[in-house]
Design a protein with these regions (language model features):
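Non-catalytic terminal extensions of PLP-dependent enzymes
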Residues: 1-5, 12-13, 158-185, 198-204, ...
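Gly-rich Lys/Arg/Thr-decorated short loops/hinges at beta-loop-alpha junctions or inter-strand turns
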Residues: 10-16, 67-76, 345-346
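General small-molecule cofactor/ligand-binding pocket signal
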Residues: 21, 67-69, 376
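Short glycine-rich or small-residue beta-strand-to-loop segments that form or flank ligand, phosphate
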Residues: 21-23, 107-110, 350, 384-388
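Short amphipathic alpha-helical segments embedded in low-complexity Lys/Glu-rich regions
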Residues: 26-29, 75-76, 383-384, 420
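Conserved PLP-enzyme active-site core in the AAT-like
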Residues: 30-40, 44-293
Length: 568
């Protein structure tokens, strides 16, 4: 109410939403609010397995069943991209074949990803709505809030695409386009045909329900933990009460007023100056790419990856390769934004450092401790550089000077160190760039956590898996190097995770509660050389659900609490 309500209404206008909620606990909380408000126990949500942990924990809180879908891997750089549209469509079609499409309530994706992969949000929503017209979309755009204020990137945001779809729905040509495609497809087209076709939804059946979360503190000028949850939902009146309950669940009763004010200031700044600020951030990023990749010394040991290295060719329908390609211009970049299944956020730059003999964590430490350059994300052999609305050309000059200095030190070490130094360096580079572990995919939930899951879908009761860990006698620990793990992987019984296991980097859960652990997951963990692994204690080992406990999952416990009489 009052001033805050007016500020939220202005934010909704700025972002193209029906309503916006200010959140003071970060986008982790925004995500959990949305998941809790929109999903109920037993509902199915199609979720990117590599999304932020807040989404997974949100599923636990809601009692919803995640149906995990996999992003395409970039094994060479120990990171994942984004989830192909055909993978999402296949999940929906499988649910339909199993007679459980009505239970699939939400598609939950990260846009853009930490490494800069941007979905074709309009195409994703249109094709999914062609299969399920009332599907809810939750776009986690924690790192992409600034994109609304770029005429080039806006179309790739959840709300930007939602507004475009809404306008299309009111165009009489939309019905004709739908009916024309239906006539071409005929009755009961096969899944193979549906997967190959760019599906057009029936505009008369669509119930447009789009939610978008933004970390305003990440890419704009809000105080730390300032976040916005934006809503464009024609059915919001049916969930408004539970949405408020979700807000009450997570919001502090003692919010920081300066933080709330900073969200309004950020909105005002971006409405007045956002176009120029974002354009400058993009220009800064392209200048960094050009300076790194064209410098004879720096490019000998470092390089910034382009779309041709980060996005497989089958997802770049326009043929766009890189912002630095001689044939690249704004027209080809716009064609990529319009046509490609995935494109790259130009402000996010993956700098390969493994070719200089540094792993990501090591190089991050050097930049921070010796040169006061802050890096947010690393991989086995790269670091992520980001330009933002506050960067200047001086920042570019400083970064390039630092990279040239480090490259010079590497070069001198090899020149002066002789054959042994070169041999050691080559072995180190090979270890970082070639001998990389395969990235593990999600396997499946143990049958004890599958309930009535469909034959073709892999959703599971993650909430029961999570709380199974609360039963200490029902859990066991096995160290990663214990031969017992290898024996059980071969002969059984299955290893079932009792917790989330999240190594940093890469920062996604390689195990979730209730998941059956496979050989590829163990191999990946054994090859990890990172120090930070949430949910795993090297001294104790992997926390597993005992087989005896699995057999009891879902059965009523003896001595259930008696019903209490009403107070007289």
């Amino acid at each position: 109410t009052g001033t805050i309500k007016r500020a939220q209404d202005k934010a909704a206008r700025a972002l193209g939403a029906d309503r916006v909620f200010f959140v003071t606990n970060g986008t982790s909380t925004s995500n959990k609010m949305a998941v809790q408000a929109l999903l109920a126990p037993g509902d199915i949500a199609i979720v990117d397995r590599n999304c932020h942990k807040s989404h997974h924990y949100g599923m636990v809180l809601a009692g919803a069943q995640p149906l995990y879908v996999e992003a395409f891997p970039m094994t060479e750089y120990s990171m994942y991209g984004a989830v192909p549209l055909n993978t999402i469509k296949q999940a929906l079609l499988n649910a339909k074949a199993d007679g459980r499409l009505d239970r699939v309530k939400m598609l939950d994706l990260t846009n853009c990803t930490f490494d800069g992969h941007i979905y074709n949000t309009r195409r994703v929503m249109e094709e999914c709505l062609a299969i399920k017209p009332d599907l809810i979309f939750l776009w986690d755009e924690a790192w992409f809030g600034f994109a609304r204020f770029s005429p080039f990137l806006r179309r790739r945001t959840g709300l930007g695409a939602a507004n475009a779809i809404e306008a299309w729905m009111h165009d009489p040509k939309s019905v004709a386009a739908y009916e024309k495609q239906q006539a071409e497809l005929g009755k009961n087209p096969s899944n193979e045909v549906l997967l190959k076709t760019r599906l057009i939804p029936d505009p008369r059946q669509i119930r447009l329900r789009v939610y978008q979360t933004n970390s305003t503190h990440k890419s704009m000028s809000a105080i730390r933990q300032g976040s916005m949850l934006s809503v464009k939902d024609v059915e919001f009146h049916t969930v408004e009460q539970q949405f408020k309950e979700a807000v009450f669940t997570h919001a502090s009763t003692s919010p920081n007023q300066q933080l709330i004010a900073s969200l309004d200031v950020s909105r005002r700044q971006m409405e007045l100056e956002g176009y120029g600020l974002v354009a400058n951030a993009i220009e800064i990023a392209i200048a960094i790419r050009k300076a790194v990749n064209s410098n004879p010394l720096i490019s000998r040991y470092f390089r910034v990856l382009g779309a041709d290295a980060m996005v497989p060719a089958q997802y770049r329908q326009s043929g766009f390769k890189d912002y630095l390609d001689p044939s690249a211009n704004w027209a080809s970049a716009l064609k990529s934004l319009d046509d490609d299944e995935f494109c790259l956020d130009p402000t996010r730059m993956t700098l390969v450092c493994g070719t200089a003999g540094y792993d990501g964590t090591q190089f991050k430490g050097i930049l921070a401790n010796e040169y006061n350059i802050q890096i947010n994300k690393t991989s086995r052999n790269s670091v992520l550089l980001q330009s933002n609305i506050n960067n200047t050309r001086s920042d570019v000059a400083h970064l390039i000077r630092v990279l040239a200095e480090i490259a010079g030190e590497v070069d001198r070490g090899l020149t002066q160190g002789g054959a042994n130094a070169k041999k050691t360096f080559e072995a180190r580079v090979k270890s970082l760039m070639t001998d990389v572990p395969d990235l593990p995919n999600f396997s499946h939930f143990h049958p004890s956590f599958r309930g009535d899951a469909g034959a073709k879908t892999n959703e599971g009761d993650i909430r029961s898996g999570f709380y199974a860990a609360y039963d200490a006698p029902g859990c066991e620990f096995i160290r990663l190097g214990d031969p017992e793990i290898d024996r059980r992987l071969k002969a059984g019984p299955e290893l079932v995770s009792a917790s989330f296991v999240i190594p940093y980097p890469p920062g996604f859960p390689i195990m979730v509660p209730g998941q059956v652990i496979t050989q590829e997951t163990i191999d990946f963990m054994r090859k990890l050389d990172v120090k930070e692994i949430h949910g795993y204690d090297a001294k104790e080992g992997l926390k597993l659900v005992r087989i005896e406990a699995l057999a009891k999952i879902g059965k009523p416990k003896p001595g259930a609490a008696p019903k209490l009489k009403a107070a007289s």
